[in-house]
């Protein structure tokens, strides 16, 4: 899996190329989390968002499909005793319905062949009235609306999923 291979260098590359965006994403997500929330982060990668939200959460369950990314996340998140790092598939989450106050899925939806499957699972595990946060980087010179069909899978998925 590509993510297992890039995991050891992921933070170095991202922090070199996009340090401000990377930090701003974590800060923005943290503002949307209520103090004391129980949060599921899907596709946590190396744990940057989980690290940003952990100080205000009662519990964070940081998940990723890639064991390589999880290895990096475990190192980064070891200082937070209330953060659990687990392997999980965003399209087939093994958590009970209504388990979390908030679910975060950063920078992943656009990478999935069937984003609707992930969105349905996210909706299923967030409690009624909970928060769903799906931040995605936008590169100003390469906007999806410049390529009309670029976001079709996501647009098709939204009405049925949420």
Provide a role label for each language-model segment:
Residues 35, 126-131:
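Short glycine-dipeptide loop
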Residues 40-92:
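Class I SAM-dependent methyltransferase SAM/SAH-binding core
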Residues 91-103:
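A short acidic, Gly/Pro-enriched loop at the edge of an enzyme's catalytic core
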């Amino acid at each position: 899996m590509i993510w297992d291979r890039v995991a050891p260098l992921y933070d170095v590359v991202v922090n070199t190329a996009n340090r401000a965006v990377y930090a701003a994403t974590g800060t923005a997500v943290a503002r949307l989390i209520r103090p004391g929330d129980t949060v599921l982060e899907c596709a946590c990668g190396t744990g940057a968002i989980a690290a940003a939200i952990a100080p205000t959460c009662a519990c964070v369950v940081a998940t990723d499909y890639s064991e390589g990314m999880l290895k990096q996340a475990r190192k980064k998140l070891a200082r937070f005793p209330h953060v659990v790092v687990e392997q999980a598939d965003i399209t087939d989450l093994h958590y009970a319905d209504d388990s979390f106050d908030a679910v975060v899925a950063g920078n992943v939806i656009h990478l999935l062949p069937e984003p609707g499957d992930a969105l349905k699972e996210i909706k299923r595990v967030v409690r009624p009235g909970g928060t769903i946060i799906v931040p995605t980087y936008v590169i100003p010179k390469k906007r999806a609306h410049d390529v009309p069909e670029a976001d079709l899978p996501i647009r098709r998925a939204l009405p049925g999923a949420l």
